[in-house]
Amino acid sequence: MKVRASVKPICEKCRVIRRKGRVMVICENPKHKQRQG
């Protein structure tokens, strides 16, 4: 899980979602997981 100021999709399978007011990226590739913080 990467914590970043700006989250962006890295590949075409990355999905930007909102959970509990946080912007997150979920993907098949675990290295692409990000959340805004």
Swiss-Prot record:
GO terms for biological process: translation. It comes from the Bacteria. Signal peptide: none annotated. InterPro entries: Ribosomal_bL36 (IPR000473), Ribosomal_bL36_sp (IPR035977). Keywords: Ribonucleoprotein, Ribosomal protein. GO terms for cellular component: cytoplasm; ribonucleoprotein complex; ribosome. One of its GO terms (molecular function) is structural constituent of ribosome. Transmembrane segments: none annotated. Belongs to the bacterial ribosomal protein bL36 family. This is Large ribosomal subunit protein bL36. The lineage of its organism: Bacteria, Bacillati, Cyanobacteriota, Cyanophyceae, Gloeobacterales.
